């Protein structure tokens, strides 16, 4: 792979001698291009098709070389629609991989996969660009410090804490709240952490991308008055884009994050919504290139593609990238090859449960399925670890007793088990929390709960001090003091009704 200098945009240095080819075949988003003998472009080189279609409209399509076919032909995947392209059209080899703008100029702006701004706010300074294909940092450059990344979300901080500079996966089926949780994390972290973030919208709904942009402007994460003061860069390759764009948009976002880490030596947050769509786009491209499908119809190169992206998301001695990735789980099946391959790369997994969402408990994080490598006494401390383990034990016991309750009813349980069930139901409700980004839906103001407050609250429930309070007092509150205040209000209301 040839890498162009960091301070040139694709094709600038090589367009003088113009290595030209011609389109010989078009199959949807895949083009076959013939080049003169001895002038074949490298794999991953960007090719540009310029010209006019049959009605005189200007065409400008960028493609990426994927295969060398022999007979001086290459197969390339288009990064935008191929409407209007015809056989015989001229194709320019830029001599370098796709390069995108990086650095402070990207903050507050929305880009497509090619690094072109799509927010109608004028051009972006492209003096500093970087190729989207790079190798992962060497072992010797990696940083191995362990520290907790506080999110202000009770269930996450207590039971599956995130690692600073780690990789976190949000697993869930359709409609259980992955994107809302990501938006809340962006909101909380931008306020409390103050670092820069890069958001990669990979194959998700355009409406959600627009909502996120509007919310970021409202909350000040994107500063409209002074765009350079913004804290986030957005890169979108949404559902309506061709598979080539959806497959590469994650790399575009990652390249921007790597610059902040390596050159600016900052701690960066990289949000990817949704990593499953990256796999899905790779599967589409693989089929279009004629590769034999593997398990469940996925591409045979699934592990390689996932590894090449994930291994670049890491912390070095210069700075860190903490990555939070939403992972769509097809048909709620965690053994599907796409989520199963993703699991191997993660430091923490937050699993969203349809059962909890159906009960109205949001965030619908499953306390028993969610895991973290950080939940160890030597990292989080004895108090945190003990509290988390007791919460899990109580929840597990409640889960075991549910069958008995369904058949025989609560009255058939022993006194001890009834107490466990009562506390587990309080814990289940106290794990819910009103979100800032969901205020418009719930009508409840959002709450940020510090880790110490979270631990104190669960210790009080487990100790039995709050056994006398009704369980609905613990639903959608912030810290434990709000729950006791809510219980008093409920008592007053019930007396007034009588």
From Swiss-Prot:
Q: Where does ATP bind?
A: 172-179
Query: Main site of residence?
Result: plastid
Q: What subcellular locations does the record give? A: Plastid, Chloroplast thylakoid membrane
Record's GO cellular component terms:
chloroplast thylakoid membrane; mitochondrion; proton-transporting ATP synthase complex
Gene3D superfamilies recorded: 2.40.10.170, Bovine Mitochondrial F1-atpase, Atp Synthase Beta Chain, Chain D, domain 3 (1.10.1140.10), P-loop containing nucleotide triphosphate hydrolases (3.40.50.300)
Q: Provide a Gene Ontology MF annotation, just one.
A: ATP binding
- What is catalysed by this protein? ATP + H2O + 4 H(+)(in) = ADP + phosphate + 5 H(+)(out)
Q: Name the residues that span the membrane.
A: none
> What does the function comment of this entry state?
Produces ATP from ADP in the presence of a proton gradient across the membrane. The catalytic sites are hosted primarily by the beta subunits.
* Family from the record: Belongs to the ATPase alpha/beta chains family.
UniProt xrefs under NCBIfam families: atpD
- Protein name, please? ATP synthase subunit beta, chloroplastic
Provenance organism = Liriodendron tulipifera
């Amino acid at each position: 792979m040839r890498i162009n200098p960091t301070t040139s945009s694709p094709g600038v240095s090589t367009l003088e001698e113009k290595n030209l080819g011609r389109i010989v075949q078009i199959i949807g988003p895949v083009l076959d291009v013939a080049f003169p003998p001895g002038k074949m472009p490298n794999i991953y080189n960007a090719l540009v098709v310029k010209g006019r279609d049959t009605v005189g409209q200007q065409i400008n399509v960028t493609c990426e070389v994927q295969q060398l076919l022999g007979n001086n032909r290459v197969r390339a995947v288009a990064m935008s629609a191929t409407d209007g392209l015809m056989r015989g059209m001229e194709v320019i080899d830029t001599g370098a991989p796709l390069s995108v703008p990086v650095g402070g100029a990207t903050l507050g702006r929305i880009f497509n996969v090619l690094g072109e701004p799509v927010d109608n706010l004028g051009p972006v300074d492209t003096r500093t660009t970087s190729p989207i294909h790079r190798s992962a940092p060497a072992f010797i450059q990696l940083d191995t410090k362990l520290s907790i990344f506080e999110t202000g979300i009770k269930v996450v901080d207590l039971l599956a804490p995130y690692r600073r500079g780690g990789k976190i996966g949000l697993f869930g089926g359709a409609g259980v709240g992955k994107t809302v949780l990501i938006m809340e994390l962006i909101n909380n972290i931008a306020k409390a952490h103050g670092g820069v973030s890069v958001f990669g919208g990979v194959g998700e709904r355009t409406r959600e991308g627009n909502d996120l942009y509007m919310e970021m402007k409202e909350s000040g994460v994107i500063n409209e008055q002074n765009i350079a003061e913004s804290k986030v860069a957005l890169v979108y390759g949404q559902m309506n884009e061709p598979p080539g764009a959806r497959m590469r948009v994650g790399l575009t976002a990652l390249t921007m994050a790597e610059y902040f880490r390596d050159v600016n030596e900052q701690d960066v947050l990289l949000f990817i919504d949704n990593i499953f769509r990256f796999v899905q786009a790779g599967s589409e491209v693989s089929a279009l290139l004629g590769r034999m499908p593997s398990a469940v119809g996925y591409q045979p190169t699934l592990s390689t593609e996932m590894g090449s992206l994930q291994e670049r998301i890491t912390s070095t001695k210069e700075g860190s990238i903490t990555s939070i990735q939403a992972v769509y789980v097809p048909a709620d099946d965690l053994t599907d090859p796409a989520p199963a391959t993703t699991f191997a790369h993660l430091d923490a997994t937050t699993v969203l449960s349809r059962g909890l969402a159906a009960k109205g408990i949001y965030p619908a994080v499953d306390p028993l399925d969610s895991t973290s490598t950080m939940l160890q006494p030597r990292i989080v401390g004895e108090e945190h670890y003990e509290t988390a383990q007791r919460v899990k034990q109580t929840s597990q016991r409640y889960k075991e007793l549910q069958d008995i309750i369904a058949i025989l009813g609560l009255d058939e349980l022993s006194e001890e088990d009834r107490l466990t069930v009562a506390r587990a139901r309080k814990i289940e409700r106290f794990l819910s929390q009103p979100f800032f980004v969901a205020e418009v839906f719930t009508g409840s103001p959002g709450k940020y709960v510090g880790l110490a407050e979270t631990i104190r609250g669960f210790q009080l429930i487990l100790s039995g001090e709050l056994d006398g309070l009704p369980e609905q007092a613990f639903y959608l509150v912030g810290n434990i003091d709000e729950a006791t205040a809510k219980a008093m209000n409920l008592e007053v209301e019930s007396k007034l009704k009588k």
